[in-house]
Amino acid sequence: MLFRCNILALVGGGRNPRYPPNKVMVWDDHQNRCIGELSFRSEVKAVRMSRERVVVVLEYKIYVYNFADLNLLHTIETASNPRGLCSLCPDSRACVLACPGLQKGHVKVELFDITRTTIVPAHESSLGHLSTNLDGTRLATASERGTLVRVWDTKSGQRLHELR
């Protein structure tokens, strides 16, 4: 659901799915109709939305679309991402996307507002979770082991804190 509005992203799944698991339906609940469709060759693992972007996560790729017209803006290659890990900053002034990098335990931080990419060598083992703060300046990561949470600066990639 996009903030507190009537726009939803739906992906098929479960026992009797209405839609296939490789399709994203952008649904306007106020109009009670589909306002956009995105189809892929593989299963959709996650969808993130902001006022400007729709981000679709597949196991090895992430697609970033313009929200207004669903035009493709970026394609990002990732390492295997079966959990659909991805964080999109909701602040419209800072378009920040964090996702798994190409190497195990690394995070790729895309700073779209200043067209810069930062690679963060977050953990030695595979990522278990990642999340940005509301204004996109910080990134928190945990590995699959779950023994450490690390906090990073998104612009510099510098580690700020480590919590056990």
What kind of region is each of these model predictions?
Residues 16-21, 56, 100-105, 144-145:
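Short, solvent-exposed loop/turn segments at conserved positions within beta-propeller repeat blades
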Residues 25-33, 64-79, 102-127, 144-161:
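Per-blade loop-tip surfaces of WD-repeat and WD-like beta-propellers in eukaryotic adaptors/scaffolds
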Residues 29, 36-38, 43-44:
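Acidic, low-complexity cytosolic segments
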Residues 42-48, 80-91, 125-132:
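Canonical WD40 repeat/beta-propeller blade segments in eukaryotic WD-repeat proteins
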